[in-house]
């Protein structure tokens, strides 16, 4: 590959940027609600369900995300003999990120739910609310306010973690920058990637800070 202009390099990086944003968005959209269901299962009175979810959370939090991505991608072939193509790489990244972050969000939800005073449940019962109504209308809105700072930390980590998709050769921002830096013998792609991650994190942090302040007024 010949020398590329700065404009050509930036155009290449833009494609990787789009994939990074896609990984970020898909992970959040699915892991946040999944994490809530996992948290509820973790607090279930069903001991078997509790134990299974506890093991799942322990594995997700106790092993590297990079290793989990490799297991999700190569697992179908080594365990079931299923052949997976290149198109599965991005899907494997989605699946790996969602199940990993759902475990972290589950623990955040759990700590928030368990911090709520028992008296609120009793007061809601006296007012004729069912358990599900109490949770959705009274408990959950307060939990979201309490856990938002912890969620913000995880979301900021997620922005940087999207670079781990390089493990499966998915052409996100870091993978693209690495390939361009090697072919062009230049640090510029890495500098551009660094600026992207910083600005992306800054925008996410500012949005979540604004959301936190807005919820505090309610």
Question: Where do the protein language model's features map onto the residues?
Answer:
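Transmembrane alpha-helices and adjacent helix-loop boundaries
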Residues: 1-218
């Amino acid at each position: 590959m010949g020398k590329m202009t700065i404009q050509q390099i930036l155009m290449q990086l833009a494609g990787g940027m789009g994939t990074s944003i896609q990984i970020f968005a898909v992970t959040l959209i699915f892991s946040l609600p999944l994490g809530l269901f996992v948290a509820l299962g973790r607090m279930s009175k069903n001991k078997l369900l509790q134990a299974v979810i506890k093991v799942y959370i322990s594995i997700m939090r106790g092993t590297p995300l990079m290793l989990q991505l490799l297991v999700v991608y190569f697992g179908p072939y080594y365990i079931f003999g299923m052949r997976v193509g290149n198109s599965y790489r991005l899907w494997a990244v989605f699946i790996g990120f969602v199940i990993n972050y759902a475990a972290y969000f589950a623990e955040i939800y759990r700590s928030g739910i368990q911090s709520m005073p028992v008296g609120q449940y009793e007061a809601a019962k006296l007012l004729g609310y069912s358990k599900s109504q109490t949770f959705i209308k009274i408990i959950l809105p307060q939990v979201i306010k309490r856990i938002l700072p912890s969620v913000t930390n995880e979301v900021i980590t997620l922005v940087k973690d999207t670079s781990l998709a390089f493990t499966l050769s998915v052409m996100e921002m870091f993978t693209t920058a690495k390939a361009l830096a090697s072919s062009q013998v230049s640090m510029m792609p890495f500098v551009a990637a660094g600026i992207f991650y910083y600005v992306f994190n800054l925008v996410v942090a500012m949005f979540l800070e604004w959301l936190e302040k807005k919820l505090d007024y309610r």
